[in-house]
Regions:
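Bulky hydrophobic segments
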Residues: 1-132
């Protein structure tokens, strides 16, 4: 069975791309913050990868699309961390890679749960609300 077509796919894709843009900005541009709790930065690494991953896994629901996205997000997590030493403000940390992977796993899990239909339901609500 094919997943339903989203009426505002272009809008959701644009918002997802903005999420990836924000992730890259955090990885390479922004100056790191001083965290007060131990391993707090690992939480933010996981969150920064979970949100765009879950978004795109909700946006593309076919099996091959999700698997391709999974590979893309895994590569982004790995190479993003490996390239961080090229930035003057960031350093390489293998535990950050694990936090990134945990975030992608969380995004995958959320997209395969009941939460994974939120985007579809919201799209249907907006499409029916503004239909002429």
């Amino acid at each position: 069975m094919n997943p339903p077509v989203l009426h505002l796919h272009w809008l959701w894709l644009l918002l997802g791309c903005a999420g990836i843009q924000a992730l890259l900005a955090v990885d390479f541009i922004f100056v790191p913050l001083n965290f007060s709790l131990p391993y707090e930065d690992k939480f933010y690494h996981a969150l920064a990868h979970a949100l765009p991953a879950a978004w795109f896994f909700m946006l593309y629901r076919r099996r091959f699309e999700r698997r391709a996205l999974l590979v893309a997000f895994l590569l982004l997590a790995l190479f993003g961390e490996l390239l961080q030493p090229l930035s003057p403000y960031h350093t390489f940390d293998v535990w950050d890679i694990f936090a990134n992977l945990a975030g992608i796993g969380l995004g995958w899990t959320l997209a395969h749960s009941r939460i994974g239909t939120v985007l579809e339901r919201f799209d249907l609500f907006l499409a029916s609300s503004f239909k002429a």
